[in-house]
């Protein structure tokens, strides 16, 4: 009996602390300064660890293992320039050397598939899973790492799991109950309140520190918000500062439960990517949605898949064909505190969340950008590329022309044929692509 009473007191004390110091402040969108103190201590610790590692690691090893240095040194010049030093006439057998070189570069380290795996860090951040290039430096550094493991798994993880459980449970229950109400302004207000509150709680569960820039450009009702995509928590990051009607792929498991509950309270659009009829239905729903300027802005991730936050890949044109005002948003995570990228082919949602909750924190910057509209004579593809370029520049990301669908599918023949056509034009046009 005494053991049960003690356990009950510990549990009640724990829940009281969680409720008083985290839940209530997150509901009202205020901070007690605890996370700021935690981040200051964390930054100082990682800076100290970086200095210790640099002092104890030979310079040659640092250069060799630096994540900023690839396996190979690429020649980024276009085909026309790359072949100019090899060919003297319209065609020479030596042209084979150029294509062989490019082929070997792609086999060793292509610029696409590496975007579907976690970004390597220049300096170890005291997390076991990023300890790729770390070797023993000193007893003091090892003790700091051990202390970090204890803090992350014995203190932060139970707290974060508690918050995540409360946040997700409230979201599922709240949206289900609100969904039973008839359509009215009250239902819309309650739906926004539930989404906003629960997302703030879930962000606290990840020790999220978010810096919003240019808030005067926040997406307005009746518009379309497009952003680069790294993780499902992109939705949490954006919804913490404002509500959206979301468009996305149907999921199973925990994500599916959340999706089915959310759609009861808010006109989110979930679809199956492989179904053509779903795609037509989505286009129709989106056109109807943006026609009503009283509805929430639509949140779309045009890449269609999660990229590791180093690049922005091809934007699907569908989002840019329906008209309306586009509100671009750039999201950039700081990998030094935790890896936000979701490798869906390797981890399910629960495993991914556990990895996030055992990281130091999730730190990111969000840039709202001036609204953009389709210019006269500009087709949907050109408009999509213009928006993608703006997001890449603002977020400091690499812009790539490749389709994120290559994560799941083979390269289309059209990409191979394009390279063949360029080479043919050079021969027919005497070495010019124009």
Swiss-Prot record:
Question: Which EC class, in a word?
Answer: transferase
Q: Which Pfam families match?
A: Acyltransferase
> Which residues does the record list as Phosphoserine (modified residue)?
68, 77
State its Enzyme Commission number(s).
2.3.1.15, 2.3.1.51
Q: Which InterPro entries match?
A: LPCAT1-like, Plipid/glycerol_acylTrfase
One GO MF annotation is:
glycerol-3-phosphate O-acyltransferase activity
Task: State the GO CC annotations.
Answer: endoplasmic reticulum; endoplasmic reticulum membrane
Q: Where in the cell is it found?
A: Endoplasmic reticulum membrane
Task: Give the chief site where it resides.
Answer: endoplasmic reticulum
Q: Keyword annotations for this protein?
A: Acyltransferase, Endoplasmic reticulum, Lipid biosynthesis, Lipid metabolism, Membrane, Phospholipid biosynthesis, Phospholipid metabolism, Phosphoprotein, Transferase, Transmembrane, Transmembrane helix
Annotated pathway: Glycerolipid metabolism; triacylglycerol biosynthesis; Phospholipid metabolism; CDP-diacylglycerol biosynthesis; CDP-diacylglycerol from sn-glycerol 3-phosphate: step 1/3
Task: State the annotated membrane topology for this chain.
Answer: Multi-pass membrane protein
Where's the motif HXXXXD motif?
A: 229-234
TM region positions:
14-34, 137-157, 161-181
Recorded catalytic reaction(s): these are: sn-glycerol 3-phosphate + an acyl-CoA = a 1-acyl-sn-glycero-3-phosphate + CoA; a 1-acyl-sn-glycero-3-phosphate + an acyl-CoA = a 1,2-diacyl-sn-glycero-3-phosphate + CoA; dodecanoyl-CoA + sn-glycerol 3-phosphate = 1-dodecanoyl-sn-glycerol 3-phosphate + CoA; sn-glycerol 3-phosphate + hexadecanoyl-CoA = 1-hexadecanoyl-sn-glycero-3-phosphate + CoA
Q: How is its activity regulated?
A: Inhibited by N-ethylmaleimide (NEM).
Q: In which tissues is it expressed?
A: Widely expressed. Expressed in liver, kidney, testis, brain, heart, skeletal muscle, thyroid, prostate, thymus and placenta. Also expressed lung and adipose tissue.
Q: Give any single GO term for biological process.
A: glycerol-3-phosphate metabolic process
The entry sums up its family as follows: Belongs to the 1-acyl-sn-glycerol-3-phosphate acyltransferase family.
Protein's job = Converts glycerol-3-phosphate to 1-acyl-sn-glycerol-3-phosphate (lysophosphatidic acid or LPA) by incorporating an acyl moiety at the sn-1 position of the glycerol backbone. Also converts LPA into 1,2-diacyl-sn-glycerol-3-phosphate (phosphatidic acid or PA) by incorporating an acyl moiety at the sn-2 position of the glycerol backbone. Protects cells against lipotoxicity.
What UniProt notes about the protein's domains is: The HXXXXD motif is essential for acyltransferase activity and may constitute the binding site for the phosphate moiety of the glycerol-3-phosphate.
Q: Which PANTHER family match?
A: GLYCEROL-3-PHOSPHATE ACYLTRANSFERASE 3 (PTHR23063:SF10), PHOSPHOLIPID ACYLTRANSFERASE (PTHR23063)
Tell me what this protein is called.
Glycerol-3-phosphate acyltransferase 3
What species is given as this protein's source? Homo sapiens
